[in-house]
Amino acid sequence: MTTQNLMCPVCRQRLELVSKTWRCEQGHSYDIAKQGYVNLHVVQHKHSKNPGDTPESVDARRAFLQGGYYQPLQQAVVHLLKDLKAKMVLDIGCGEGYYTSAMQQVVEQCIGVDIAKNAVQRAAKLNDKVTWVVGTGATLPVIDQSMDVCTSLFSPIPQTEILRVLNDDGYLIVVTPATDHLYAKREALFEQVNPHTPQKFVEQLQDLFELKEQQVIDAPLVLDQQALKNLIAMTPYAYKASPERRMQLEQKAHLQVTASFQIYLFQKRNKKAI
């Protein structure tokens, strides 16, 4: 029997791994799928049959990230976790696991959760040392005060749930597009380009979390045609741009563009200090 920090989504008790099934004391059970993940997204929490990213966008993102274009961001997050000496980490919105798999190598236990089953299925093939979970931010699948760090990279930030699962001195790492992220690509797709507004997250989180550090990672990229197509397909831009502008951009042999990432490190505020 293996004990970790997973929580039953029905009764909220700790799950124990017996053979290849996660079970709680109330008798609820969740089998590990043949791909190596567990589905803790119970029916009553679902709003659609296949929530999350489409298989097409998941495949495009996996192909793009495997090209190493966002490796500077991946390594920056890993270094941050090492500096924090984190042991228990929950990656919220893990997708196909590119960042989560790297995180696992510097912590004791790493849990990756995503609402998109097709993404988690792909992630589970990447690294069997990560505990991969299909679940939702509305009910994070871990027990109270069990995590040293939660991470949200380009993903939702369920504040109340993050507060619940972090220990008293726990940290939250948020990664979001910096002001001019992929400006050249957006300029080609849209007549008007609005700058990203990463500062809004600091304002949204300030009551519950204290900002400890922030940094911007810039990664100048030269994309060939296939990488460019993958980059467009893996983001919401694919659906918001006009078909004509998208086609025109996808026909380019190369595109020079700078990826710019805003990294925020927050710490859970001490209730006694508020």
Where are the language model's segments positioned?
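Conserved Class I S-adenosyl-L-methionine
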Residues: 3-4, 216-274
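Class I SAM-dependent methyltransferase Rossmann-like catalytic core
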Residues: 47, 52-72
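Conserved SAM-binding loop of SAM-dependent methyltransferases across substrates and taxa
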Residues: 96-107
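Conserved SAM-binding strand-loop segment of SAM-dependent methyltransferases
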Residues: 128-140
